[in-house]
């Protein structure tokens, strides 16, 4: 999958699952299962339920994604 093919959306983490998987409610109402990208894992960025995140989705499977960024709280 090329980088430009990814669909990037924002959402809220609703549930933390084993193996660094998370259930994320997207802003458009869909619910996806997402894992953490390598840079977030390498830099030990903690993701907790309630955090706002950016998720990359592939056009082939819109039910799974990758968390690429944790948004700052305002």
Swiss-Prot record:
Family under the similarity heading: Belongs to the IF-1 family.
Organism lineage: Bacteria, Bacillati, Cyanobacteriota, Cyanophyceae, Acaryochloridales
One GO CC term, this protein: cytosol
Alphabetical keyword list: Cytoplasm, Initiation factor, Protein biosynthesis, RNA-binding, rRNA-binding
PANTHER family listed in its UniProt record: TRANSLATION INITIATION FACTOR IF-1, CHLOROPLASTIC
Gene3D superfamilies per record: Nucleic acid-binding proteins (2.40.50.140)
Entry keyword annotation includes Protein biosynthesis: yes
Start and end residues of each S1-like domain: 1-72
Compartments, as annotated in UniProt: Cytoplasm
InterPro entries per UniProt: NA-bd_OB-fold (IPR012340), RNA-binding_domain_S1_IF1 (IPR006196), S1_domain (IPR003029), TIF_IF1 (IPR004368)
Subunit structure: Component of the 30S ribosomal translation pre-initiation complex which assembles on the 30S ribosome in the order IF-2 and IF-3, IF-1 and N-formylmethionyl-tRNA(fMet); mRNA recruitment can occur at any time during PIC assembly.
Function: One of the essential components for the initiation of protein synthesis. Stabilizes the binding of IF-2 and IF-3 on the 30S subunit to which N-formylmethionyl-tRNA(fMet) subsequently binds. Helps modulate mRNA selection, yielding the 30S pre-initiation complex (PIC). Upon addition of the 50S ribosomal subunit IF-1, IF-2 and IF-3 are released leaving the mature 70S translation initiation complex.
GO molecular function: ribosome binding; rRNA binding; translation initiation factor activity
Statement: the UniProt record of this protein carries the keyword Chloroplast: no
Chief localization: cytoplasm
Protein name: Translation initiation factor IF-1
């Amino acid at each position: 999958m090329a980088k430009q093919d990814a669909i990037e959306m924002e959402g809220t983490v609703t549930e933390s699952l084993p193996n660094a998987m998370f259930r994320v409610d997207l802003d458009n109402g869909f619910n996806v299962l997402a894992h953490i990208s390598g840079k977030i894992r390498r830099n030990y960025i903690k993701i907790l339920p309630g955090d706002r995140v950016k998720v990359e989705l592939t056009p082939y499977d819109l039910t799974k994604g990758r968390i690429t960024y944790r948004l700052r709280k305002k």
